Amino acid sequence: MCTRQLTITNPHYKKLAEDFRVSIKCFSGREDFKLHVPCGHCDECLRKRQQQWFLRANHVMKRLKLRPEQCLFCTFSIKPEVYEQTKEKPYLAIRRFMDRLRKHPRFREKGPSGRYRYRKVRFPYIFVVEFADGKRARERGLESTHRMHFHAILFNCPLYWWQVRDLWESCVGRAWVDPLNSEAGVRYVLKYMTKDCKAHQYISDIDARKNGKLFVSHGFGRLSKEDIKIMRENMLRSSTSWFCVYINNFRYSIPRYWRTACFTKDEIKCRNDSLIPAVLWSIVQQKYRGLSPFQQQRIYYCLLWQ
């Protein structure tokens, strides 16, 4: 749970006030006029975001039936000539690299008219921005410049690892590319998303906003109609399956995107109202087993009506 929740005005009432040209204070008496939302930057929020993107990546690998060695684990650095330009707009370097990859001679073929063309190449990918923390520089007795670089996973990339390495090194900088050993490599790359916190803000404010920034391919982890049907059935099996999913015997909370894709708002509210009280009471009994039943009830009601 977020440790620094923000209180905001419900955007729904802002829109209603604009549409009917009335003061937003007219809706201040509504129960959901003020909403408590996660801050998105505390350790808990970043950890939750990392886990949710790992679930998407795991879903991509299952849907495409990929083995880890069919994915590429990459670290991309940037040469001085293009460093400032890349640091200002990291997504441009990624986009240009992907454009060059799609125009690789391997994808050049003759069309029906006899003219050469490039066949369409699409595959999922993840890029995470990181600014060096200076740890290795200190070990070598050097001063760190906290340079920006990318960590990436290319899922089912149609090129060999050395071709990807040569493409990046031909115009952007150094590259270290290897086949992925296991899904732990995906978690390793996504852990750099947690760099967006005070403990790692040793750089300027502008650069700090980019530290841990995530870039993914269009539609990454999107659910198909068949996926929605299967997930809907699985989530309705029990109270546990509604809140979490197991991957390699590890429990992960269900991403909000999956729940909203499979159910309507009314269905989600109805399901939560029926399950949360019982689940919360069992958690209170387990965590505060040394307290009296009366004290447990007080804690339970405080948490339930927060």
Regions found by a protein language model. Give the residues of each.
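Right-hand nucleic-acid polymerase module
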Residues: M1-H146, C157-Q306
